[in-house]
Curated annotation (Swiss-Prot):
Membrane keyword on record: no
Recorded name of the encoding gene: surE
Gene3D superfamilies named in the record: Survival protein SurE-like phosphatase/nucleotidase
Top-rank EC class of the record's enzyme: hydrolase
Name of the featured protein: 5'/3'-nucleotidase SurE
GO MF entry, a single one: exopolyphosphatase activity
Source lineage: Bacteria, Pseudomonadati, Pseudomonadota, Gammaproteobacteria, Enterobacterales
Reactions the enzyme catalyzes: a ribonucleoside 5'-phosphate + H2O = a ribonucleoside + phosphate; a ribonucleoside 3'-phosphate + H2O = a ribonucleoside + phosphate; [phosphate](n) + H2O = [phosphate](n-1) + phosphate + H(+)
Organism of derivation: Escherichia fergusonii (strain ATCC 35469 / DSM 13698 / CCUG 18766 / IAM 14443 / JCM 21226 / LMG 7866 / NBRC 102419 / NCTC 12128 / CDC 0568-73)
Co-factor remark: Binds 1 divalent metal cation per subunit.
Length: 253
């Protein structure tokens, strides 16, 4: 199995390094990751400037100022030959649950892999300690995929409780929960008296029902949420069409 491995925490982050070491025991792994933390970069792609890469002695490649999406795009289309069999993103330092997937560079890297035609996993740890647990879970899933491919055409968003492996209760297939809207902005002043602003933490849980990713992780289970790229709200199409007809938009300007 040939794996393109990326993340949004940066090439030196403990999550990606722990996972790379574990994956290399049974797979051919090429790391292509940002040279710095690009958390929250979502699906952004660098179009207005060129991208430089740096290759380390162990073969890992850092993309200078690159986003997670840049890294997977370059990895698939230029840097990994032969091309990968699968794209894996992670292990992220912290969860990507519910609405987090909108902003997540970790999920975006997997999404780019799927967009380019490859199976893709995004892996996040609900904390900053037991990366070995998340690595073991990921390896188990990938070994299973080797034996029997999962032909859903979907991204698997995997969130792992920050627990020792022997305390993980199992795996649940879940849906995305949701958070309350975030509203915290933290102002500061620089030495010249100019105001600086920091984006605050995400909102608290809003929908954390028993079938959600939030609930699974809170209860000690690995959460696997299948994600797809199509953002169309199919069940709203008729409602919008009826509304347009009723208000006359499209027949008079």
């Amino acid at each position: 199995m040939r794996i393109l491995l990326s993340n949004d925490d940066g090439v030196h982050a403990p999550g990606i390094q722990t996972l790379a070491k574990a994956l290399r025991e049974f797979a051919d792994v090429q790391v292509v990751a940002p040279d710095r933390n690009r958390s929250g970069a979502s699906n952004s792609l660098t179009l207005e400037s060129s991208l430089r890469t740096f290759t380390f002695e162990n073969g890992d490649i850092a993309v200078q100022m690159g986003t997670p999406t840049d890294c997977v795009y370059l990895g698939v289309n230029a840097l990994m030959r032969p091309r990968p069999d699968i794209v894996v993103s992670g292990i992220n330092a912290g969860p990507n649950l519910g609405d987090d997937v909108i902003y997540s560079g970790t999920v975006a890297a997997a999404m780019e892999g799927r967009h380019l035609g490859f199976p893709a996993l995004a892996v996040s740890l609900d904390g900053h300690k037991h990366y070995d647990t998340a690595a073991a879970v990921t390896c188990s899933i990938l070994r299973a995929l080797c034996k029997e491919p999962l032909r859903t055409g979907r991204i698997l968003n995997i969130n792992v409780p920050d627990l020792p492996l022997d305390q993980i209760k199992g795996i649940r297939v879940t849906r995305c929960g949701s958070r309350h809207p975030a509203d915290q902005v933290i102002p500061q002043q620089d030495p010249r008296g100019n105001t600086l602003y920091w984006i605050g933490p995400p909102g608290g849980k809003c929908d954390a029902g028993p079938d959600t990713d939030f609930a699974a992780v809170d209860e000690g289970y690995v959460s696997i949420t299948p994600l797809h790229v199509d953002l169309t709200a199919h069940n709203a199409q008729d409602v919008v069409s009826d509304w347009l007809n009723s208000v006359g938009v499209g027949t008079q300007w």
